[in-house]
Amino acid sequence: MCGICGQFRFDGKKVSSKSLDMMMSKLARRGPDSSGKWIEGAIGFGHQRLSIIDLSNLGSQPMVDEKLGLTLVFNGTIYNYKSLRALLVSLGYIFFSNSDTEVIIKAYHCWGVECLERLDGMFAFAIWDEDSQKLFIARDRMGIKPFYYNASSKAFIFASNSQALLTQDLDKSINPVALQQQLSLHGVVPAPNTIINGIQKLKPGTFIILNTDGEIQEKTYWSPSAKRPSENISDQEYIERTHELLTAAVTKRMDASDVPIGVLLSGGL
């Protein structure tokens, strides 16, 4: 559970290091192992790290790939990063770390926004593309990893929690509709709303592209299918398939870690 934050300014001002520090202070509990900060004029990223894959400093963030002109902050885990890395190596990419973070950078450089179709995992990340001068942001299909943001004519700011955004100058008034949802829907406020008017959530399965003028392009790259299975199978076959899927899901998560694994059993499964 890492913490990410960032600012992309459109008003001609540079990102303030102190302002970024204020945001990172509200993310510290999410990443106790190390912290990192990167500022380049009007764009700046902050990261609080909880080390899971590649525990060395080479896996630290924000991760900068100077050769590709890309900088990334990322929260999450890419379960199939090893197979993606092998594919990218076969395509000529050279890696300097063993992290899934770097796999995202190379995948984005190789396939652009289509890289999202290849990522199997839980994630929220932001990539600054120096060549195109654009910011690319994406959230995983089910919205497991959080991504909160505020968009104005002056700047686009984002973080893994709303507390980090509340350190900034934005509308902090209560959204009454979202508050009612918070209290009546078991604490769930459907994206993009939050109980704070000046803070939004990026929808699951969605990406955003921003340019230096503050223009925002938002697109849904995945949504669940509402179609019923065409096959006519028995209840026992459904049980067996569910067991197979759960086994496969647990297995791939166990393979994506360089630290000891713990298991929490609820009463549900």
Predicted segments with their positions:
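Cysteine-centered catalytic environments shared across enzyme families
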Residues: 1-269
